[in-house]
Amino acid sequence: MTSPDSLANYYFDENEADKVIDFFSECLTHSTGQWRGKPFELLEWQIKYLRELFGWRRSDNGKRRYRQSALFISRKQGKTELAAAIALYCLHCENEPAAQCFNVAADTDQAALCFNAAKAMTENEIELSTRSEIYK
């Protein structure tokens, strides 16, 4: 019998890994700063992070291996935009009924930054905005 965290219990799905990368480049634009309105072009480290996060699947049911993630990087590296984009991907592309995504922050002002980024990305993309209802 293999342990629950044994690699025998998981597989890497190239299609799922590619799907998340394609979503970023084809469906999202930056919401703030000098890149506002421009396509979300991922940096190499972001591509690696997202492929690892979304590509690994459970052998027993095909669901993602990782349900939570913590990313620690320095200031002004695009954490907020990346978190907002990941939340939008989970909401729109994982085919989970009544999907929920949570953004955890030290205070409401900090949490609002991520919410507002996701809101702007949604409003900038016709396909996302027609599938969404934003209440705030």
Q: Where are these predicted regions, by residue range?
A:
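Phosphate/NTP-binding elements of NTP-utilizing enzymes
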Residues: 1-136
